[in-house]
Amino acid sequence: MEGITGKELILAASAIGAGLAMIAGLGPGIGQGIAAGKGAEAVGRQPEAQGDILRTMLLGQAVAETTGIYSLVIALILLFANPLIRLL
């Protein structure tokens, strides 16, 4: 029986790392849901400030989404363009 080669170990670790990176997408999703709920509450309390509330909420959600996008990019790099495999 043969042992695990270096390439197989890197591929397995990359798959685990990609999965962990995608778990990082949960945080922004939960945060954006809370922000949208609070924005809806704020508009309900002050309908005349709807434009300001919407603008601030969308800016905050865009900033929060960058974390999810970065984790997706890292996962895609680990799965499809892994630079560590070339080192073997």
From Swiss-Prot:
PROSITE patterns: ATPASE_C. Gene3D superfamilies: lithium bound rotor ring of v- atpase. It is a multi-pass membrane protein. It holds the Pfam family ATP-synt_C. It is found in: Cell membrane. Keywords: ATP synthesis, Cell membrane, CF(0), Hydrogen ion transport, Ion transport, Lipid-binding, Membrane, Transmembrane, Transmembrane helix, Transport. InterPro entries: ATP_synth_csu_bac/chlpt, ATP_synth_F0_csu, ATP_synth_F0_csu_DDCD_BS, ATPase_proteolipid_c-like_dom, F/V-ATP_Csub_sf. The keyword Repressor does not apply. The chain crosses the membrane at residues 10-30, 68-88. F(1)F(0) ATP synthase produces ATP from ADP in the presence of a proton or sodium gradient. F-type ATPases consist of two structural domains, F(1) containing the extramembraneous catalytic core and F(0) containing the membrane proton channel, linked together by a central stalk and a peripheral stalk. During catalysis, ATP synthesis in the catalytic domain of F(1) is coupled via a rotary mechanism of the central stalk subunits to proton translocation. F-type ATPases have 2 components, F(1) - the catalytic core - and F(0) - the membrane proton channel. F(1) has five subunits: alpha(3), beta(3), gamma(1), delta(1), epsilon(1). F(0) has three main subunits: a(1), b(2) and c(10-14). The alpha and beta chains form an alternating ring which encloses part of the gamma chain. F(1) is attached to F(0) by a central stalk formed by the gamma and epsilon chains, while a peripheral stalk is formed by the delta and b chains. Belongs to the ATPase C chain family. NCBIfam families: ATP_synt_c (TIGR01260). This is ATP synthase subunit c. It comes from Alkaliphilus oremlandii (strain OhILAs) (Clostridium oremlandii (strain OhILAs)).
